Amino acid sequence: MGLERAFADEPAFVPYLAAGDPNYEASLEYVEALARGGADVIELGLPFSEPIAEGKTIQNAIVRSLEAGMTPDRFFQFVEDLDVDVPLVCMTYYNLIYQYGEGDSESRSDSENASGETASQGPRPFVEKAAAVGIEGLVVPDLPGEEAGPLRTACDEFDLDLVFIVAPTTKGDRLERMLEQVSGYVYVQARLGVTGAREDVDDATEDSLARLSDWDVPKAVGFGIKTGAHAERIVSAGADGIIVGSALVDIVAEGHENGDSTDAVADRLEAKARELKEGALRGAAERPQPERT
């Protein structure tokens, strides 16, 4: 398990796009543009018909992807077809993970894994396939830490990281259970507070980072980051990385609605990626430097 390596030397830029939005071929180009623009890890959304944890922008992207024919097996082919040299993470929902393989005769077997589940049940077939095509981690927004045992076991077996989303309200025992099982990085869900022309980090974001400070895992902040200035402020406040989805999905949606060429949209995505990565690097330079002894 090695997503932590993306955070080792500098703040990581982690963009998100829904795989297959607005169509298979264009989406390949868009993901590759993000890699050229400086992405350190790329989160690929595997669409699910009931994306309860997503905002309107990403819900619309998921609808476009589903209408274009995206399925789990097509998603895995998509990953294999990508020409990128950065770690890939799959973001999807547990029902889809759990049900994968039920209709695949090659996945059905009377054999059992160490937990006693048959190979045709539970998350194991999905995790095995994800690892085989090159996915290095999973983000599962609807999976509570206390119910993550079977997925954690499968991820351990196939060397995948399991990333949890920590909201400002995630505290106490629930937070402890998540952090005991997380690997790769923590997705810290937070918002930017904007007052007039001044973009700043709200108290909830700083509180979340402070609560996680004793845990030796990278903290990547997402939710509401749209500009290089946002990225700069988040990293200067102590984040190890930034996660950006809606701002990038908006570029895809606008290009699709306007009938822009794939190349034009890819160029805009690459430029936005560079802006965000450069903002994160500026934020790292602004952090207080430890005193030399």
UniProtKB/Swiss-Prot annotation:
Region spans: Disordered: 103-123
Q: What is its EC number?
A: 4.2.1.20
Q: Which CDD domains match?
A: Tryptophan_synthase_alpha
Q: Name one GO cellular component term.
A: cytosol
Which pathway is recorded for this entry?
A: Amino-acid biosynthesis; L-tryptophan biosynthesis; L-tryptophan from chorismate: step 5/5
User: Which reaction does this enzyme catalyse, per its entry?
Assistant: (1S,2R)-1-C-(indol-3-yl)glycerol 3-phosphate + L-serine = D-glyceraldehyde 3-phosphate + L-tryptophan + H2O
Q: Which UniProt keywords apply?
A: Amino-acid biosynthesis, Aromatic amino acid biosynthesis, Lyase, Tryptophan biosynthesis
An example of a Pfam family matching this protein is Trp_syntA
The UniProt entry's sequence similarity note says: Belongs to the TrpA family.
| Job description of the protein | The alpha subunit is responsible for the aldol cleavage of indoleglycerol phosphate to indole and glyceraldehyde 3-phosphate.
Please give the PANTHER family that the UniProt record associates with this protein: TRYPTOPHAN SYNTHASE ALPHA CHAIN, CHLOROPLASTIC (PTHR43406:SF1), TRYPTOPHAN SYNTHASE, ALPHA CHAIN (PTHR43406)
Query: Which protein is depicted?
Result: Tryptophan synthase alpha chain
Upper classification of the source organism reads: Archaea, Methanobacteriati, Methanobacteriota, Stenosarchaea group, Halobacteria
